[in-house]
UniProtKB/Swiss-Prot annotation:
Domain ACT stretches: 66-141
PANTHER family attached to this UniProt entry: AROMATIC AMINO ACID HYDROXYLASE, TRYPTOPHAN 5-HYDROXYLASE 2
Subunit structure: Interacts with DNAJC12.
Chain positions found as Phosphoserine: S19
Protein name: Tryptophan 5-hydroxylase 2
EC top class, as a word: oxidoreductase
């Protein structure tokens, strides 16, 4: 019997200067009003809150703010003031001067600077100490992103940070349980350790190492490939059947060849923008779903034990390549997968569990209706001969997919599922997940920037404005295309 397949463990649910010293005249003494204006901010990240670094000169993602202070006409005043910025490692990225609007004998200096919150507070204390009058009028919050995200679980803000997620493996692929078919096979265990080392050494941007599969591994792959290929025409969804021949043509999907992840990743990138990367074993649901947010799918490279080719207690490369990859090449399915991932970023453990369960009963064990017939699109079904037959038989309990109730269904690992969930289409499932995602408690929304391959936190008008600008550009392109089409049709 084929167990439930997913690349996260269901057992772990609970769980932006220069120096101005020589560029300004020595003619002033710092005296008057100091005003702080909120600018933008970006944050580094660690375990919680995606908090910023304490060294602005080495942290391009530290907070940005603007300071306006007035100087009395005395020699050396400005230089003394600016040296305080240098001493406290506050990076000045822009400086301007103007006549004071309050006193004609003074000059106001505007400094756009970049620093961490600690350095900024220390700078203000020095300015107060060296001047007679300093009035500090900051907005209600500076570095609001840092403060608002302080209690939010850490999540990757750029695609390269998936290295951290990928290496936080809960169960390594080389750690086999006593009832695993390969537990007593030392040669197989050493082979699994090799695949773990490959995955743990991999970093974002590198080509995925090519594996020279053994004759035994290729033979095992061949058995699985042959048996499942017989069922696909009558059991798999149309999107799967459309992409499978393309994988044969471009990625070497054959009975006598185990495809390479690098070839598969390049193919997916051209088809749907997805990519794959090797992983050493089970990830937590949070880390696995974070990969989907960046259109990155974590894949194992090892092959199941040859003693039982039609069974594996954990996801192997047969499951990944035959179950997941053909659907990840479909743009609509790829979008559906990414939206589940995006909804998980910064969510509570409880909400991540609900999202992971919805993932389980859709992307792993989902059914859809096509031409009046039930068809499978879940990877756990499409890589399991026995459960694929069972799920489409009269013996299976099939329910309509509704995230609110589906998220409460128990996920079974070593037996067939007690219920399967059907959607009319990927689009319907996606819309239902979008509505469900609105119930997730987060003090912000997120937006994936495909140009920088980063996640932008949308929590104020400034951050939302950037997304609106992109939407305007896209709408202008659509309107231009419609106008040209109307001209061509004479409308």
């Amino acid at each position: 019997m084929q167990p439930a397949m997913m690349m996260f463990s269901s057992k772990y649910w609970a769980r932006r200067g220069f120096s101005l010293d020589s560029a300004v005249p020595e003619e002033h003494q710092l005296l008057g009003n100091l005003t702080v204006n909120k600018s933008n901010s970006g944050k580094n990240d660690d375990k919680k809150g995606n908090k910023g670094s304490s060294r602005s000169e080495t942290a391009p993602d530290s907070g940005k703010t603007a300071v306006v202070f007035s100087l009395r006409n005395e020699v050396g005043g400005l230089v003394k003031a600016l040296k305080l910025f240098q001493e406290k490692h506050v990076n000045m990225v822009h400086i301007e001067s103007r006549k004071s609007r309050r006193r004609s004998s003074e000059v106001e200096i505007f400094v756009d600077c970049e620093c961490g919150k600690t350095e900024f507070n220390e700078l203000i204390q020095l300015l107060k100490f060296q001047t007679t009058i300093v009035t500090l009028n900051p907005p209600e919050n500076i570095w609001t992103e840092e403060e608002e995200l302080e209690d939010v679980p850490w999540f990757p803000r750029k695609i390269s940070e998936l290295d951290k997620c990928s290496h936080r493996v809960l169960m390594y692929g080389s750690e086999l349980d006593a009832d695993h078919p390969g537990f007593k096979d030392n040669v197989y265990r050493q082979r699994r350790k090799y695949f773990v080392d490959v995955a743990m050494s991999y970093k974002y941007g590198q080509p995925i190492p090519r594996v020279e599969y053994t004759e035994e591994e290729t033979k095992t792959w061949g058995v699985v490939f042959r048996e499942l290929s017989r069922l696909y025409p009558t059991h798999a969804c149309q999107e799967y059947l459309k992409n499978f021949p393309l994988l044969t043509k471009y990625c070497g999907y054959r009975e006598d060849n185990v495809p390479q992840l690098e070839d598969v990743s390049m193919f997916l990138k051209e088809r749907s923008g997805f990519a794959v990367r090797p992983v050493a074993g089970y990830l937590s649901p949070r880390d696995f779903l974070a990969g989907l947010a960046y259109r990155v799918f974590h894949c194992t490279q090892y092959v199941r034990h040859s003693s039982d080719p039609l069974y594996t207690p954990e996801p192997d490369t047969c499951h990944e390549l035959l179950g997941h990859v053909p659907l990840l090449a479909d743009p609509k399915f790829a979008q559906f997968s990414q939206e589940i991932g995006l909804a998980s970023l910064g969510a509570s453990d409880e909400d991540v569990q609900k999202l992971a369960t919805c993932y389980f009963f859709t992307i792993e064990f989902g059914l859809c209706k096509q031409e009046g017939q039930l068809r499978a699109y879940g990877a756990g079904l499409l890589s399991s001969i026995g459960e694929l037959k069972h799920a489409l038989s009269d013996k299976a309990c099939v329910k309509a997919f509704d995230p609110k109730t589906t998220c409460l269904q128990e996920c079974l690992i070593t037996t067939f599922q007690e219920a399967y969930f059907v959607s009319e289409s990927f689009e319907e499932a996606k819309e239902k997940m979008r509505e469900f995602a609105k119930s997730i408690t987060r003090p912000f929304s997120v937006h994936f920037n495909p140009y920088t391959q980063s996640v932008e936190v949308l929590k104020d008008s400034r951050s939302i404005e950037s997304v609106v600008q992109d939407l305007r550009s896209d709408l202008n392109t659509v309107c231009d295309a419609l106008n040209k089409m109307n001209q061509y049709l004479g409308v």
